[in-house]
């Protein structure tokens, strides 16, 4: 169960360390995600890949790197494992013979559909930890940080 409390904020210099605070926030978000999706659920990265592939069939792994922000080597390993699990299918790209195109399998589409409400519930729980007036700003700031990683 996720624990919350303001006492953890009073840790001296760590209380103003963005890297420390982001790490703690990530731990909390991962705990909530795991509670909502369950032990057999998709990981956050698996969900991100399936969601991206659902938006556009035939994406190359390079395009998936850009869409998900997952680094190239991690994504290659992830796609290989997801293909072995039957969540994705790979084929030669029609646009670039050197590249492999990725698309959802029927199993991947079913798992994605089942995961969406669970991930939405996790996201709602995370956002509910913030006052309503801060939620949009928080999301915008996270998007800015994520965009800086792509720059």
PLM-predicted stretches and their roles:
Residues 1-40:
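N-terminal leader segment of winged-helix/HTH proteins
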Residues 1-14, 132-151:
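C-terminal regulatory/oligomerization modules of transcriptional regulators
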Residues 22, 53-57:
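Short helix-to-turn junction characteristic of helix-turn-helix DNA-binding domains
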Residues 30, 58, 62, 80-144:
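Charged, amphipathic alpha-helical coiled-coil/dimerization segments
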Residues 49-50:
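Short alpha-helical "packing" element that flanks the helix-turn-helix/winged-helix DNA-binding module
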Residues 65:
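The alpha-helix within a helix-turn-helix
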């Amino acid at each position: 169960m996720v624990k919350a409390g303001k006492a953890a904020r009073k840790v001296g210099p760590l209380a103003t360390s963005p890297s420390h605070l982001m790490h703690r926030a990530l731990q909390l978000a991962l705990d909530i995600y795991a509670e909502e999706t369950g032990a057999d659920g998709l990981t956050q990265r698996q969900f991100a890949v399936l969601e991206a592939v659902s938006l556009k069939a035939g994406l190359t792994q390079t395009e998936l790197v850009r869409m998900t922000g997952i680094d190239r080597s991690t994504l290659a390993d992830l796609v290989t494992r997801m293909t072995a699990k039957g969540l994705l299918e790979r084929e030669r790209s029609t646009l670039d013979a050197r590249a492999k195109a990725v698309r959802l399998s029927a199993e991947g589409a079913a798992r994605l559909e089942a995961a969406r409400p669970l991930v939405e519930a996790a996201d709602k729980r995370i956002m509910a930890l913030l006052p309503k007036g801060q939620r949009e700003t928080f999301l915008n700031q996270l998007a800015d940080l994520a965009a800086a990683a792509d720059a």
